[in-house]
Amino acid sequence: MQSITEKIDIKALTLEELKASLKIIGEKEFRAKQIYEWLHVKLVRDFEEMTNLSKELRAKLASEYELICVNDLERYESKMDGTVKYLFRLSDGNVVECVLMKYHHGNSVCISSQVGCRMGCRFCASTLGGLTRNLKTSEMLDEVYQIQRLSGERVSNIVIMGTGEPMDNYDNFVKFIRMISSSDGLNISQRNITVSTCGIVPKMRALAEEGFAITLALSLHAPNDEERAKIMPVANSYQLQDVLNACDYYYEKTGRRVSYEYSLVDGVNDTAACAKELSRLLKGKNCHVNLIPVNPIKERDYKRSTGNNIQNFKNILEKNRINVTIRREMGSDINAACGQLRKSYTDKTMVQEVNL
């Protein structure tokens, strides 16, 4: 039950929800369309910027609603490829990171779905501090909005592959998809949105029923349960065959080809035997494998595969008629891999606090 003093998160309201909410406070329904456009098209950060509303209405909105925005904390631009890494501060002081990647086909942003992550994948910097909390729908939206504001360029593609497991924040993530792709908002095509999961089977199946046209990317990283469990604790909860069945179900329901993400770790999952086993596992599936040279993490004793091993792995998959690419590295000179910048910032902050 909402307390008397708690304000409503206006940015997390759909247009229909906003209409209903405004009616409760005695405002006309047509105002909802105006306000929604200010929030989700013009991307304003303050009610005072809504200049076609009366001063009285703006004051009323400020008293009834909370306008949640993320704030630019640090920003780094790659000298290699123009990739921009953003560190955003949330209203409670937590920080999240996002990446803007510029391609010839448009601008793509990688956003976070949680502050930290509880999945514990051994090769990922995001999990080192555990999970702090879920991001609100409004915060996920404003990650995209803030990047578009700061860059001055339209965002056309979104990958939800930053910090966090989206399926562990399912309701907020699903509402984010509906709102970011709404024709009343930024209207980003669902076909240009990709969500990554480590394999939470019930939520994957639920996502297949949502009627979305987004791409599902599975963080696979090993060709069998035994090896997968060594680097991904989630494998102890969901058997690989059940995860793959959920991927097949997603393809059946949506017609969208599933992408399998495979981070190559030297001496762990990059052998020819692993490549052959992976080929057998995915044989006959309409899918794509994305090979990722793992980013070294000083807290883990994992190293990226050699260039020869990466190419050999790819060749074996291709010989077995598996669609495969090696992910292009972007922003490697600015710690653009998931979790690296946030961790560097929090480590630095902790050192400063200790030295006070």
From Swiss-Prot:
Residues the record lists as binding [4Fe-4S] cluster: C117, C121, C124
| Pfam families, alphabetized | Radical_SAM, RlmN_N
Gene Ontology CC: cytoplasm
Query: What are the catalytic residues?
Result: E97 (proton acceptor), C338 (s-methylcysteine intermediate)
Q: Which SUPFAM superfamilies match?
A: Radical SAM enzymes
Task: Tell me where in this chain the Radical SAM core domain is found.
Answer: 103-333
Where on the tree of life does the source sit, at the highest rank?
Answer: Bacteria
**Cofactor note, please?**
Binds 1 [4Fe-4S] cluster. The cluster is coordinated with 3 cysteines and an exchangeable S-adenosyl-L-methionine.
Per UniProt, subcellular location reads as:
Cytoplasm
Under Enzyme Commission nomenclature, its number is 2.1.1.192
Question: Which reaction is this enzyme known to catalyze?
Answer: adenosine(2503) in 23S rRNA + 2 reduced [2Fe-2S]-[ferredoxin] + 2 S-adenosyl-L-methionine = 2-methyladenosine(2503) in 23S rRNA + 5'-deoxyadenosine + L-methionine + 2 oxidized [2Fe-2S]-[ferredoxin] + S-adenosyl-L-homocysteine; adenosine(37) in tRNA + 2 reduced [2Fe-2S]-[ferredoxin] + 2 S-adenosyl-L-methionine = 2-methyladenosine(37) in tRNA + 5'-deoxyadenosine + L-methionine + 2 oxidized [2Fe-2S]-[ferredoxin] + S-adenosyl-L-homocysteine
For the keyword Nucleus, the answer is no
Q: Listed disulfide bonds for this chain?
A: C110-C338
Binding residues for S-adenosyl-L-methionine, per the UniProt record?
Answer: G164, E165, S196, S219, L220, H221, N295
Per UniProt, the keywords (alphabetical) are:
4Fe-4S, Cytoplasm, Disulfide bond, Iron, Iron-sulfur, Metal-binding, Methyltransferase, rRNA processing, S-adenosyl-L-methionine, Transferase, tRNA processing
Role? Specifically methylates position 2 of adenine 2503 in 23S rRNA and position 2 of adenine 37 in tRNAs.
Q: What else is known?
A: Reaction proceeds by a ping-pong mechanism involving intermediate methylation of a conserved cysteine residue.
The entry's protein name is Probable dual-specificity RNA methyltransferase RlmN
* Naturally occurring in which organism (per UniProt): Lachnoclostridium phytofermentans (strain ATCC 700394 / DSM 18823 / ISDg) (Clostridium phytofermentans)
| Gene it is expressed from | rlmN
